[in-house]
Each structure stands twice: as structure tokens, then as C-alpha cells.
């Protein structure tokens, strides 16, 4: 998928922008706070029907405006034109259209324009709790496996109901408890199986990307942890019932799964430098891109790289740019504050690219840089 052109009105600090993009590399240069991330967020919005940074839609309207509009004009991998429109007025329902036909459900649009975004917020995958790492698995697997998504929805419904029973001050209903536990176990076994299969296939690709970027300076790994590894999930959940009633929530199940992120034999959270952590996260997201491309039929995802070069040495920056400029990846959108070093790298790799300057919400193409 290629985003050929975008039109933006009143989105965050972007009052108006009409931009035509390179089918390969697009770089947005400017100081922090100028609107580079907002521009990438508008591209993200057209894929996921929401902002990557602010889930409250009305707050994404420019302060002086009463509405925002984002329109994207795409070309599929098969050369077919596609138009996506999003509009929101204050205190009104959001409109989302594909080729001028409005969606009945926004969820019908998800997956049509696959996209992977790498941003500073990804640091929470290492530094944060296990919920973010489970969400990472869920986002990838749910985009290509409907059975997984259905099982996850069933599991979460049963978990919510079981937790409500555990908290209830009324007489304990053992029969109803068993109903929810059996649903948790049957759905949870599907979730566990598919997460296990995903991680087993994902790890070699992830390690390959990390090895390339670091030039084999360090070894990395991912280890999947789940209560389901120690036996039948129903027995595990039932055995925890007494303790769960004391705590008021479910302590065992796939909702407690985790990914252990390792540098060598140790947790990267404890041992990794800022540069190693950043490299680890970028390799994770590039592997996610590769996985979605393989499982998504004939659609190449868009790749957004927001301020990813901070904390990386010049060598690793060059390795990453060379990698994503290759044929394995499609259209790329990059933000950076350092115009000079990025321009030198891009000229070295001899691929088509455009450079845009972003200042106080105004975006202008710098043709003289893209020689």
C-alpha cells in the first residue's frame, strides 16, 4: 500500500496541509513540538480510525477550529486507487469513508491499510508492565487470525464475569463460577496455543533484525511465559479459586501472560543501555512489519518511524535506514530533528526520497535536499 497524497485540515496543530509523497522514503525534519509527530499521527489515524497519542477525538481538533478533516489517497500493491476520508465536528459523530461510502462500523476498516508505527512510547514495552507486552502480541495476531480475536474476546468476557463473582458479597454461586471458569479455560487454551505459535515463528525474524542493526555485537531473545505451560488451564484456574476469593480477582490465566525480553541471558530492562533498548524495540517492530506482510496477503504495510534515532549511535542509524530502504519494506515515513546526517545517509543509499520541513504546524517540501 502506498499513500500518494494526504490532505489535512485543523488536525492538532496542523491548520492546513496538502502533501504528495514519495512511494519510498518521506522524511519530516524540524525541532521538537513543531508538528512532525502530528503529521505521522494523521497517517496513523487513516489506518486505525483513531489517534496513536490521544484517544479523545475532540481534543485532536485544532484549538481554533470546529472540525478536522483528514483525507488519504492511496494506491494498492495491485495499482488500484483508494480514497479514505475522516471528518469530525465538535459534538458530532465521526465520519469515516472509503471511496465516498461511509462505514457502518469503524472496525470494518481496521486492517485495510496495514501500518506499523515505531515511536518513543514503545519504551513502555521494556519498562512497563506485562499488559503492554500482551497487547503487543494481541495487536499482531488479531490482524491475521480471526479465531484468536474471537477467543480473546470470549476469554475477557468470562474473566470479567468471574472477577465480578469473586468480588460479590452475595452467597457464593459455585455452579456459575464453574461456567465462567470453563469458558476462560477453553478460550484461554486457544489464546495460549496461538501466542506460542506466533512467538516461535516471530523470534528468529526479530533476532535477525537485531543482529543486522547491531552487527552481531549482542545476542537477544524473547521468552514467552504463561500459567498454561504448567498444566491444564481449567485445573490451574480452579486451584487458585480460594486465593482469588480473598484477593477479589483472578490471579491465574492467560491474562497474566508475559514476554521476557532478554539481552544475553539477562532481562534487557535491567542490563540494556539506552541504545540497546532502542535497538531492541526497533527490531521488535520491524519483525512485526515482516510478520504482517507475510500474513496479510498482497498488502505491504506502511512504516512510520517517529523520532527513533535519538539515543542511537551514527552506525546504528545508518544500518536502520539502509535496512528499511531495501525492497523488503514499502513506503516509509521518518521524523528527525537532524536534517544533515539523515540527508547524508539517504543520498548514500540512492533510493527515491522526499524531505519536508515542519515548523509551527506548517509543512513545506524541501526539493533542494532531494537531489
From Swiss-Prot:
Annotated GO MF terms: ATP binding; single-stranded DNA binding
Keyword terms: ATP-binding, Cytoplasm, DNA damage, DNA repair, DNA replication, DNA-binding, Nucleotide-binding, SOS response
Protein name as annotated: DNA replication and repair protein RecF
Gene3D superfamilies reported for this sequence: P-loop containing nucleotide triphosphate hydrolases, RecF/RecN/SMC, N-terminal domain
Stated family: Belongs to the RecF family.
Coiled coil (UniProt feature): none
Domain of life according to the entry: Bacteria
PANTHER family for the chain: DNA REPLICATION AND REPAIR PROTEIN RECF (PTHR32182:SF0)
InterPro entries in the record: DNA-binding_RecF, DNA-binding_RecF_CS, P-loop_NTPase, RecF/RecN/SMC_N, RecF_2
Species for this entry: Phocaeicola vulgatus (strain ATCC 8482 / DSM 1447 / JCM 5826 / CCUG 4940 / NBRC 14291 / NCTC 11154) (Bacteroides vulgatus)
Annotated compartments: Cytoplasm
Function recorded in the entry: The RecF protein is involved in DNA metabolism; it is required for DNA replication and normal SOS inducibility. RecF binds preferentially to single-stranded, linear DNA. It also seems to bind ATP.
GO biological process: DNA replication; DNA synthesis involved in DNA repair; double-strand break repair; SOS response
The keyword Transmembrane helix is assigned to this record: no
Residues the entry annotates as binding ATP: 30-37
Principal localisation: cytoplasm
Cellular component aspect of the GO annotation: cytoplasm
PROSITE patterns assigned to the protein according to its UniProt record, in alphabetical order: RECF_1 (PS00617), RECF_2 (PS00618)
NCBIfam families: recf
